[in-house]
Amino acid sequence: MSVELIREYWAYHHWANRRLFDVVTALGEPAAGREVGKQFSEPTPRAMLVHMYGADRFWLETWQGRPPAVVRGDPTYGLDIRTLDDLRRRWDALEAEQRGYLTDLVEIDLWKPVDGATPEGKIFSRPLGMLLLHVPTHAAHHRSELCTMLTMVKVGS
């Protein structure tokens, strides 16, 4: 694990998120809000994007030592984001913060422990580098769900 690897992985994470966000935006707000099934982590494409944004926000604030402003354990992190424009504005600001955080990383930071608790109260301690790899991996799962959702929305329209 290296800072260079982490930065490259996050560059891909940001690129892939933006690509899918652009597809959802091109389909429009009605499609973004269309429920496509309970088999997904979130019921609508917009809710899936909000979940992904919320997870990124939660972890950045945790790594910065700030109490997260989002509600952990709620799939959309307690966020009330009703439009793609609102989400894009927030996500752009978050990406800028993430890039700044990643720019300041040095190799030794990757091994610093991050302590916390799951929504169920289970205590954990993991090296920062492992958590920096976890977040884009978490998003990859949801991006794959979102691709299937978008196929269903497009076919169902």
What is each PLM-predicted segment?
Residues 107-120:
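Carboxylate-rich helix-loop segments that flank metal/cofactor sites and access channels
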Residues 1-4:
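Basic/polar N-terminal segments that are highly enriched at the extreme N-terminus
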Residues 7-76, 118-157:
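Short, contiguous alpha-helical
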